Amino acid sequence: MLNVSGDALSRRGYRTWNGEAPLRETLAAALVSLSGWKPGQPLHDPCCGTGTILTEAALLAEGRAPGINRHFAMEDYLCFSGVDFRIIREEELSRSAPDRVRNISGSDINPEALELARRHIRQAGLNESIIPLEQIALQDLSVDKENGYFICNPPYGERLSDQKQCRALYHDLFLLKQRHPTLKLCAISSDPAFERSFGRRADRKRRLYNGRLECVYYIYY
C-alpha cells in the first residue's frame, strides 16, 4: 500500500504549535459544520486558543481546499513526476472566495495563545485583519453579534487539579449564553459533568473523538 499523503490528512499544514489542549483540524472543521453555521453568519470562539476553529471556519467560508498549503508525499514520487502540483494549487485557489470570510472573531485570556492564533491564520493563507482577536476573560466578554454562533473547545480538566477551574468556566459559558440569547452556543468537552456545571441540559448532543479522547459536542439554542 502506497502512502501518498505523508503526514496524516488531519494536519492541514498551518499549525506550528498545538497549545495545551490541541484540537485536530479535521475535528474543528466538523464542529463548525455540525453547529449549523453558514458562511456570513456571525461566529465567535470565546476560548479560541491557537485559533483552529476560527481558521477552519474561515477556510470553509472561503471555499478553500483543505491542506492546499501543505506538502504531500506523492509530490516526491516518480510516478507523479508528470504532475504539476503548483498549477493544481493555483487552480484550486482561483476558486476560493476570500470576500466570504466575514463575521468571524475570537477571544481568549491567554496572550501567547492569541499570538499563535494570529500566526496560524496567516500561515493558512488568510487575512488576519478580517478575523479580529481579543484578549479578555470569558466572564467579561460581550460581543456585538446577533443570530449567530459561539463555537468553542474549552479546557477539559483531564487532571483532577484542573477540574474545579474548568467547571467554573463551563458555568461562565452558560452566563455568556444568557447575555446573548440570540446566539447558539456549541462546546465540545470530555467532562461528563459538563451539563451540570454549565447549568442546563443541551438541546442537542453528538458523541465525537478528539484523537483517542471520547468527547461530547453540546449545542444550546
Question: Which role does the model predict for each range below?
Answer:
Residues M1-R15:
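Non-catalytic substrate-recognition/targeting regions of SAM-dependent transferases
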Residues V4, C47, S189:
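Glycine-rich, histidine-containing beta strand-loop boundary motifs that form or position
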Residues V4, R118, F198-G199:
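Short, flexible helix/strand-to-coil boundary loops that buttress conserved ligand/catalytic motifs
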Residues V4-G6, P111, Y156:
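Non-catalytic surface loops within mature trypsin-like serine protease
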Residues D7, R95-P98, N153:
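A short alpha-helix capping/helix-coil boundary motif
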Residues G13-L23:
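Class I SAM-dependent methyltransferase Rossmann-like catalytic core
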Residues L23-S142, E158-R159, Q165:
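Conserved S-adenosyl-L-methionine
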Residues E134-Y221:
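C-terminal catalytic and target-recognition region of SAM-dependent MTase-like enzymes
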